[in-house]
UniProtKB/Swiss-Prot annotation:
Region described as Disordered: spans on this chain: 627-689
Compositionally biased intervals (Pro residues): 673-689
Pathway entry: Antibiotic biosynthesis
Encoding gene, per UniProt annotation: thaF
Disruption phenotype: No production of thailandamide antibiotic.
InterPro entries: Ac_transferase_dom_sf, Acyl_transferase_dom, Acyl_Trfase/lysoPLipase, Aldolase_TIM, FabD-like_helical_ins, Mal-CoA-ACP_Trans/PKS_FabD, Malonyl_CoA-ACP_transAc_FabD, Malonyl_transacylase_ACP-bd
Major place of residence: cytoplasm
Domain of life (superkingdom): Bacteria
The name this protein goes by in its record: Polyketide biosynthesis protein ThaF
Length: 1154
């Protein structure tokens, strides 16, 4: 278990730093990172001569990396002693330590992130702190002062909770607690982590989440941020660790459910034993609780006790302990593959190991020494001979190294073929079995025909994958990731030849076709892979005795994975960059290339430029071998590794079927049907979506759960007042998306299903909006409620006039910073007084807000100056004005978190509670008769997200991005085909075309397009140059040829035809404004191309979209809904609501122990 801020003190871990080399080694590593980034030494602050116990230690720039370093170093020390955790638990900053131990992200990367996070908090956040309160959380919930001036950060057990906030506010809270006689104490921190105090740093965190790597945990990770086991962490999740509330009790219960509590030992590796104390209060017996560090304990003796404790327990199968060196540094052996062979290799080794050579000759049927020394008929260049030769030379070199120097490596790894040598060195199989496997592998690969390979130099993996996705090269896979910008591709020979033009135009500085006849490590090797799988089946392959890094994953093999990994390696990429970075992250500082040549040493310098390289020729017993292969620039591409298809490649491994319920009576009651194969061309429009009632009928009103509480039903989700006010059955809204993407069909489908849809009016003419209103009204003869989008801007007044003429009574107000006269006029036009004297407001406004000051404007009555003017002008009566003063502008407020399109990058868990409180406070102060419902939008694409929103108090949810990829969406089918493929990381931020000069951002699709990169480039050019004439010739040519497809003069002529006359007049007198108009033209062009589905301009598509759609795609993967042609907006809403209700019921039962 790893704790967070508040548990630190000067001198934590001093005894371990002085007595344990492994502990000292890791602390020193992070001391170097901290000194490089801040100029401050962790070691000096913790253990230096001027470091005094008891002095304040709350400088986040130091405490962030110090807490991480000490806890991580202690965990690695235990691992070096053979103690491997079965599960890791993190709380607050401790979650980062747990993530690093579980290999979710590299430790040094996390430390750098924490240091940057601390710096950003210092810039953006007011001073704050946290209070630990001894007493039940009901104290907080029952105190107006506590709820107003602080946030509940976490409830650790029945009599202990933590609150946080701004310093000035918490002083009031302390006074209130003192008056009530409640015991509390301040934690030694400078900020109120997990509270409103750190909300200002959220945009910074989200904007820089790409700086964090994120992989699936190799050790089960229980997170207090998640309140359970984290199975598929994202970079966004890691950024939330300092922001979201802590849920220690839920995380602890999740751990207990992973195994028998009677055999579970809870080891607190934090500085103060904080989490062990919490676990004890939750009922964990003392003999199952262990603390290593403490300000007054004997850390070294406690470390010994924990090490002995774990030594008596069985190690989980397949988890070999890394033999971490207790000396100055760890080292790893690297074994090269094809590409390193030279005539004369192994000459000094063959006579030294005659028995091994006799075995090799018997297995191969020829004289291996003669092959290597004489190279008859250039056979060393033929893979069926190269592979056995390299394996034997590598193996003998390893044996010689061990005889000459008994030190065992901490890790071993091999490149492609070299992985077999690494596995032999680790004892996974015998010398002769390894040779038999390699012989067969070489024979199968030599039989491959019609394939080719090429090295792409100068581009990284993402760029190579992007070019492959955008090209017509459908058969090419990435085969080797040798260095960050040295990548080998493989595929059909004709495509490999054609690919040269694509990559050279894409910016590579060299494209080298390799002299091979097969597309090794690509999908073209699938037949060979299947044959090899049959061949390897009877071999005796055991668990490696030394950790071996697998080519396919870049992570260590577990005991039962080796056979499968060698089979997959035939047709999967060699992730050599990941391999080396992983080894470096584990503390490896010395690399020895075992075998012949210096290919891997050369690559090492490119992957880890801060390290001089491997120990090179000194690591090999062969004199002169290093000079046998001359280093080149760029270095010679190495062995052909396995390749998975890039993003655009079709075949993907199947995952577990979704557990979503069917949404129609005819659907199967079990798992959804498998997804159909992607259609080669757009299919005819499917039949209308099925009725929703059967989907919701699974949870009848009488359903209960073991007599504890009724199961959550869909109708119960959200606020009854919201549903009553807007005439809905369900608390679900489909928001308006511009250019009619939120279409007539979409609005009608939602209305007929008892939900609300808003037509997307942005970018449309008044005539088009009028036609849409009439079409919707005609399709809803029963008068089902619908809504129209209303945007702040130059068409606002005319649009309100249109709505009043056409009888529109419900609008979604978007992009407003304040209440305008037009919006007030729409509201007032619906006010009347009934026969009982009560005010009736027939016109409903749902206001989308992302900032507290905007929420305040909509929660307030219509500004008095507007009312006075409207009365004076006869627009409204005195009675209407009096009624307006007693009600807010908005009938509902929707808090907009980080969404597709325009976004302030807000975080739902921070924004929603804050604005809910704000709205409640304003309503109370003004004495409003009715509640103003507060809902949420942004990031809702799965039942889990919907459930989280309702748990946070949302009165309704609003979705956007996921509806864009449906049958009813008004976007082109080409875009829908692209959108159904995206994942959560496939969006990016780009300048907003309508607010280009201000630098406002929109969130857009990144995968498969150049728009975000080009749009950001245009904004940088706009900042750099003052006129079109200032643009360098090379830049002008690039814009005209690559971006616009026409001359800048032609673009400006288009602007003169499109933009209002007053804007053109300003541009004629202001060269900077003219430049802006020309650049803004690109944004309109990119949007029009996407709407029309113009494939010739596909790379320029602007598609506003958020990561919620990526999450939805993952949820429905391998179900019928994977194909957008089966996605109906109302059916999707039904499934999300039903599964959210089911999830909430299950979570409740787990909380009460049922």
């Amino acid at each position: 278990m790893f704790s967070g801020q508040g548990s630190q003190y000067v001198g934590m871990g001093r005894a371990l730093y002085e007595s344990e080399p492994t502990f000292r080694h890791h602390v020193d590593r992070f001391d170097e990172v901290t000194r490089d980034k801040t100029g401050t030494s962790l070691v000096a602050r913790l253990y230096g001569r001027d470091a005094r116990a008891g002095e304040p230690f709350d400088d986040t720039h130091v405490t962030h990396p110090a807490l991480f370093a000490v806890q991580y170093a202690l965990a690695r020390t235990l691992q070096a002693r053979g103690a491997q955790p079965d599960i890791v638990l993190g709380s607050s900053l401790g979650d980062f330590v747990a993530a690093a131990l579980a290999q979710v992200a590299p430790a040094q990367e996390i430390v750098a992130w924490l240091i940057d996070q601390a710096a950003s908090m210092a810039r953006a956040c007011e001073p704050g702190f946290m209070l630990a309160v001894l007493g039940p959380a009901s104290i907080y919930r029952g105190s107006d002062t506590l709820r107003e001036f602080s946030d509940l950060v976490g409830v650790n057990y029945a009599e202990h909770f933590v609150i946080g906030g701004n310093r000035a506010d918490l002083v009031r809270v302390e006074a209130a607690l003192a008056r009530e006689g409640v015991v509390f104490h301040r934690l030694p921190v400078r900020f109120g982590f997990h509270s409103r105090n750190v909300a200002p740093v959220v945009p910074w965190l989200h904007a820089r989440e790409a700086n964090l790597s994120c992989r699936a945990p190799t050790i089960p990770w229980a997170s207090c941020t998640a309140g359970g086991i984290v199975e598929a962490p994202t970079a966004r999740f890691l950024t939330r660790i300092a922001i979201d509330p802590l849920r220690f009790q839920e995380a602890a219960r999740a751990i207990e459910q992973t195994g028998s509590p009677d055999t579970l030992h809870w080891v607190d590796l934090g500085p103060s034993g904080t989490l062990a104390n919490f676990a004890r209060r939750l009922g964990v017996p003392n003999d199952r609780l262990h603390v290593v560090m403490g300000p007054f304990g004997d850390d070294a003796r406690a470390l010994g006790r924990v090490s002995n404790l774990h030594a008596s327990n069985a190690r989980p199968a397949g988890a070999p302990a890394a033999p971490v060196s207790e000396g100055v540094s760890m080292h790893a052996f690297l074994f090269p593959g094809q590409g390193s062979q030279v005539k004369g290799m192994g000459a000094a080794l063959f006579a030294r190991f005659p028995d091994r050579m006799r075995l090799a000759n018997e297995i191969l049927g020829y004289d291996l020494a003669a092959l290597c020394i004489e190279n008859p008929d250039n056979r060393l260049g033929q893979t069926q001979f190269t592979q056995p030769a390299m394996y034997v030379v590598n193996a003998l070199a390893y044996l010689a190294r061990r005889e000459d120097d008994a030190g065992a490596p901490a890790f071993v790894a091999g490149h492609s073929l070299g992985e077999y040598s690494a596995l032999f060195a680790a004892g996974a199989f015998s010398f002769e079995d390894g040779l038999r496997l390699v012989k067969k592998r070489g024979e199968l690969m030599s039989a491959a025909r019609d394939g080719g390979m090429a090295a792409v130099l100068g581009l990284d993996e993402a760029r190579v994958a992007e070019i492959l996705a955008l090209s017509d090269l459908r058969g090419i896979d990435i085969a080797n990731l040798n260095a960050p910008t040295q990548i080998v591709i493989a595929g059909p020979a004709d495509e490999i030849r054609r690919a040269q033009q694509w990559f050279e135009q894409g910016g590579c500085y060299a494209y080298v076709v390799l002299p091979v006849s097969g597309a090794f490590h690509s999908r073209m090797m699938r037949d060979a892979q299947r044959e090899f799988e049959r061949f390897i089946a009877p071999f005796d392959i055991g668990a490696p005795g030394i950790p071996v890094i697998a080519n396919v994953t870049g992570r260590p093999y577990r005991g039962d994975e080796v056979r499968r990994g060698l089979v997959e390696q035939i047709a999967s990429p060699v992730r050599w960059v990941d391999t080396i970075r992983y080894l470096s992250e584990q503390g490896v500082e010395r690399f020895a290339e075992i075998g012949t040549g210096t290919v891997l040493t050369d690559l090492l310098r490119k992957i880890l430029p801060q390290k001089a390289g491997a120990s090179g020729a000194a690591a090999r017993p062969q004199a002169g071998a290093a000079s046998a292969v001359a280093a080149s620039a760029p270095p010679r591409p190495t062995g052909m590794a396995d390749a998975q298809p890039p993003a655009a490649s079709p075949a993907r491994a199947a995952t577990a079927a979704s557990t979503m319920p069917p949404a129609s009576a005819s659907a199967s009651a079990s798992a959804p049907a498998p997804a159909p194969a992607p259609a080669p061309a757009p299919a005819p429009a499917p039949a209308p979506a099925p009725a929703l009632a059967p989907a919701f009928a699974r949870a009848p009103a009488s359903t209960s759960t073991n007599g504890i509480a009724p199961a959550a039903r869909v109708e119960q989700l959200g606020c009854p007042e919201f549903k009553r006010r807007f005439g809905l059955k369900y608390a679900y809204v489909a928001g308006g998306m511009v250019h009619g993407i939120a279409s007539v069909r979409m609005v009608v489908a939602m209305a007929k299903a008892g939900m609300k849809g808003y037509f997307g009016t942005g970018g449309l003419s008044l005539d088009a909006i009028r036609d849409a209103v009439r079409a919707i009204r005609g399709a809803l003869p029963a008068g089902e409620p619908y809504g129209m989008n209303l945007l702040s801007g130059r068409l606002e007044e005319a649009t309100v006039d249109l709505y009043l003429r056409e009888g529109v009574t419900s609008v979604e107000a978007a992009a407003y910073m304040h209440v305008t006269p037009a919006l007030a006029r729409f509201k007032l036009a619906g006010l009347s007084v009934d026969r009982d004297g009560a005010t009736v407001s027939a016109h409903k406004i749902l206001a989308k807000v992302s900032r507290p000051e905007v929420a305040t404007a909509f929660m307030s009555p219509i500004p008095e100056k507007f009312l006075e003017r409207f009365v004076r002008d006869g627009v409204i009566s005195d009675a209407q004005a009096r009624a307006a003063r007693a009600m807010p502008v908005a009938d509902a407020v929707c808090v907009e978190a980080d969404s597709g399109g325009h976004t302030d990058m807000g975080a739902m868990p921070a924004l929603l509670p804050a604005i809910r409180r704000l709205c409640a406070d304003i309503a109370g102060e003004r004495g409003y008769r009715d509640k103003v419902p507060v809902g949420v939008a942004g990031g809702i694409g799965t039942p889990e997200a919907a459930a989280a929103a309702f748990v946070l108090g949302a009165d309704f949810i609003l979705t956007g991005s996921i509806n864009q990829c449906t049958v009813e969406s008004g976007i082109s089918d080409v875009v829908k085909d692209m959108l159904q493929q995206i994942n959560v990381h496939d969006t990016d931020y780009a300048p907003a075309g309508d607010m280009f000069e201000l630098g406002a951002k929109v969130q857009v699709l990144r995968r498969g397009v150049f728009f975000p990169a080009r749009a950001n480039r245009l904004y940088e050019l706009y900042k750099q140059y003052d006129s079109v004439d200032d643009l360098p010739d090379a830049v002008r040519r690039q814009l005209e040829d690559k971006y616009f497809g026409k001359s800048l003069a032609e673009v400006y002529a288009d602007c003169e035809r499109y933009y209002p006359a007053d804007e053109i007049e300003r541009a004629r007198g202001n060269p900077k404004q003219k430049l802006a108009l020309i650049f803004r033209w690109y944004f309109g062009f990119a949007t029009r191309a996407a709407l029309a589905g113009n494939e010739a301009d596909k790379v320029n598509f602007q598609v506003q979209c958020g990561p919620a759609l990526g999450a939805f795609n993952q949820w429905v993967r391998n179900t019928a809904l994977e194909n957008w042609r089966n996605r109906h907006v109302a059916e999707m809403a039904a499934r999300i609501l039903q599964d959210a209700a089911d999830l909430l019921s299950r979570r409740y039962l787990s909380m009460v122990g049922r």
